[in-house]
Amino acid sequence: MIQRLVALLLFLSAILIAFPSPLRAQADYKRYFDEDNLPKVREIFSQGRYDIVIQVCEYADRRGQPSWEWRVLHFEALAAIGRYEEAYDEAKKTAERFREDLGALLRLHRFFKIHGYKEDAAARLADLNLAAKAVPKKERTTLDLVHLGEAALILGADPSKVIEQYFGPAKRVQPKGKEVPPGLLEAHLASARLAEAKEDLKKAAESYGEALKLAPTNPEALFGMAKALFPSDREAGTTYLEKTRAEAPLHFGALLLQAESAINFEQYEAATELLNLVESVNPRHPEAHSYRAILAELERNDHTAFEQARGIALSVWRDNPEIDYLIGRVLSRKYRYEEGAEAQKRALAFDPGFLPAKLQLALDYLRLGRVDAAWPLAKEVAAADPYNVLAFNLEVLEKEIASFTSVKTPDFIIRLPPEEAEIYGERVVEILTEAKKVLGEKYGLIIDHPTLVEFYPDQQDFAIRSFGSLGGDGLLGVCFGSVVTMNSPGSITAAKSNWEATLWHEYCHVITLTATKNKMPRWLSEGISVYEEKQRQANWGQEMNPDYRKMILEENALTPVGDMSQAFFQAKDSMAVMFAYYQSMLVVEHLVETYGLEKLRAILADLGEGALVNDAIARHTVPMEEFETSFALFATKLAEAYGPGVDWTKPKPEEMNPRALLSIASYLKDHPNHFEARRLLTEQLLEAKNWDAAIESADAFITLLPEYTGQGNGYTFKALALRSKEDAVGEATVLELLAAKSAEAFQAYQRLIEVNFEKGNWDGVITNAARGLAINPFTERIHYCSGCAHEAKAQPALAVRSFENALRLNPANPSEVRFRLARNLKGDDPAAAKRHLLDALADSPRYREAHGMLIEIVDGRPTTPIAMPPAASPVPAPAPAPSAPKEEPKEKEIPVPGDKPTPAPQ
């Protein structure tokens, strides 16, 4: 790029020096001059050498060159270096001279509009309309089609028709060899800009990609691709930003996007350096000063500096809505939704029709819990711009949420699908109520307004609600302060995670974000939430594991506490993200254990007043360097204490074949404490169905590292072998050990329910049912077994609740569940019992026990006590009789759902 730039500069110098007057008398000479030289000047302009462009354009003007583009490039270059008043004067002259040139009028309209000259911009509309009509249809070039399409959009045409009638035909023109026809590149760029304006970043990326096929080094296409990819693929977006700056080192857009990214990642010094580069070219650049205002707020909590920088940003155009829109959007990205919303209100005060601010304000209101104020704004944007993807998605989301039910208490508004509310709504209230009491008292916070909590069964709805776009895969919940959004525990995304632990985690964010007025770094908020999970229940949260041990002791993966935010921002994969959560929790644990909870509360209070986190920690503990040293020692000792007798070395290929049982066994003789070899041996013994040897090896594995409950743990291996030997008692014993250590051993809980059910151990059934429902409350068998256990313990109210949930989840034998409901209801609610019996008989007319109980209720006989233990000998309902039997069918018993043993834990 540098060599090409030097060549262009030499060429342009030749233009300025070698041709003081025309060398040829031909009338077409000036046109040839334009055709030869304008492409090179455009390239110089795109690379940010505005000073050279101004000189060349002034020379062209003195020569009387006919193309309007010399004048347009002249005033655009003047504006780019901050000479706005001169640029306006030149633009006015150009507007008077070129009233019929569509390309000139488009650039003039854009210049006047983005710099706040509303009357001049409006005046160009009439000129645009006349100029567009003046282009004969048969004579339209590819570039004419692009210009006509852009003019049509400005004049309010339907975007789909513009694509169909103008951009589409222009893009269908085929290149001739390596030569790109004039207008083809522009057609793809115009399509990309249109998609970007409608927030359809996928289509924008596709169009920018087509443009790059034609012009691989075009800065506009490279930067456009960066913007389109950045929200969904930061790594790819960063690559295109770097490519943009390789071609145009001082490209304003690329520099500013890099600065915004640096601000998002709390790299404030880097952001300042990037802004300095922009201002080295244009000291008055409005967006650069907008970012300086943001830095004043986030980095220094300096309100005076904020207002000064904002004032400079508005000095070019005092009513520019873009300034406060940008400020608010970035502040909201940093969870400062109140400040962000106020900024959008200022932007809308400048221009009530400024749609980006209106849409961003709708998002801010959603995150602040002001839902009723958000939807009308989103509708206004959708009405004004029917092709805006985000506005459309918000309309769809509103309809989805409208179908939700609300579970309300004085402290919470819980929104979720009505069918889900019936299943786990009460449990949500129980957990949140406990969390508010425990955590509120612990952190000395009284929240006097309801917290909004929403559960989404659809990942896309969760993403739109939480992020304003698709994405967020892998995230179970998000807290914005007074609003929590969560994936439903029944959603695919939730998988086998413990939703109760997640809910506790998210409500802890409510406490800490409220305490700090959302002025705290992500790492500290996450660290406290994970820490409080473990305080609530020992097997919640995160524990040391082999991966974390290796990262601490062998990979030097601990992030210095002073740079903890980068642990999240620079995480290279999902494991690095999880380790960031874990290390954040360890920092909090170390802080509380060493300095006390009161110091943590004091740090949060300082953050709420605008202090930076490192300053707050140092103020209430020790200097940051000393704190980092003590923490590193703390974390290292934890890692060293994890499996101290375990051999963690990696075997050489010649020492052990991981696929050969004999090779593994031989290696273990010399390395009896080797973690991976022991795991592999146990696994292969199971595959070989050598149950006794597998049990012995699993015991050795458990003894080696009893804390390990991850994939392929000794408890699971041993349980599989014991089950294969039909040793249910031994299997249950080892699974109980696993269940006590892991809050996500779903299959172990299911198996324990079955084993305890068969033994009539009702307390065991109830305990493991609660564990299982904390992961997936939509498992009908768990509710059924829980109901049977409560019935056996003469707890009819709890039994009814469980059986009702089982019935809602479409059991294989609904008649039998209804019979059990009736049996537990008949004492307190005979009418409800009667309804359930009638429904049971409607499905199974020959259900004798149901007939008997119905007669008992109808005749008003005294109700008899529930037989004990009813669950051990369930009363199955007969199958419904065929509708047109040829002969009297035999009575057929339907087995209780789940009688077939469930798979052992994997």
Regions found by a protein language model. Give the residues of each.
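Beta/coil-rich, acidic/histidine-enriched accessory regions frequently appended to metallopeptidases
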Residues: 28-32, 36, 42, 46, ...
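Register position in tetratricopeptide repeats
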Residues: 46-47, 80, 114-115, 154-155, ...
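Single-residue signature of alpha-solenoid repeat helices
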Residues: 53, 87, 121-124, 162-163, ...
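Residue-level recognition of tetratricopeptide repeat
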Residues: 42, 76, 110, 150, ...
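Juxtacatalytic substrate-recognition/specificity segment
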Residues: 27, 43, 120, 124-127, ...
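Canonical tetratricopeptide repeat
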Residues: 73, 107, 147, 190, ...
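Start-of-helix register in tetratricopeptide repeats
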Residues: 35, 69, 103, 143, ...
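Short coil turns that delineate tetratricopeptide repeat
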Residues: 31, 65, 99, 133, ...
